């Protein structure tokens, strides 16, 4: 699911006036499932390339929502995409046990692919290799720490808002064996859960 907002207005509309816009577009992060951490939403910014040139007018921005956790061994679905003009960041890939990995901006566990669909520069990284690994983040793949939960992949910093803030970290994995430590969160991702029995 995504939400649309008409939030940008430059000038009175039309007239051929061109503006340079600095942007940061981060998609929704995915929920975890059956021990694995969810992948972060895709991270795309003009700081990696150059400002976007757009004409005066109204623009709709779509903000991708996160996907929640799921019970049992099912995979959490991919989260929502975020869109600004020609820039689309893909929602993070969900995680589950014994189910196909979810690809996305950053991938879910069991090697879910990040940067899907591929863009340059990359919008994210792969999920960790095991069911209790962390989800991928904007600057690092999800980590494995078997049998404890793996850390989510690191996110990235952006100064678009005027100060440096970390975004798009992967979710931590849950311990596969009861009473093992969960994986820590990274840069906006959620920490893993604990299994007690």
Regions found by a protein language model. Give the residues of each.
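Low-complexity, glycine/proline-biased repetitive segments and flexible coils/loops
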Residues: 2-197
């Amino acid at each position: 699911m995504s939400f649309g907002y008409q939030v940008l207005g430059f000038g009175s509309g039309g007239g051929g006036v061109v503006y340079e816009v600095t942007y940061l577009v981060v998609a929704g992060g995915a929920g975890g499932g059956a021990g694995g951490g969810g992948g972060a939403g895709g991270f795309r910014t003009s700081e990696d390339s150059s400002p976007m040139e757009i004409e005066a007018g109204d623009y709709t921005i779509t903000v991708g929502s996160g996907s929640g956790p799921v019970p049992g061994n099912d995979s959490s679905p991919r989260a929502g995409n975020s869109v600004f003009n020609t820039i689309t960041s893909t929602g993070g890939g969900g995680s589950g046990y014994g189910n196909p990995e979810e690809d996305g901006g950053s991938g879910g566990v069991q090697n879910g692919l990040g940067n899907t669909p591929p863009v340059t520069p990359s919008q994210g990284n792969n999920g960790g290799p095991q069911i209790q690994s962390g989800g991928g983040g904007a600057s690092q793949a999800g980590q494995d720490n078997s049998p404890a939960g793996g850390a989510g992949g690191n996110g990235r910093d952006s100064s678009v808002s005027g100060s440096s803030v970390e975004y798009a970290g992967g979710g931590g994995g849950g311990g596969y064996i009861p009473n093992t430590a969960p994986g820590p969160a990274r840069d906006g991702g959620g920490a893993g859960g604990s299994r007690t029995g």
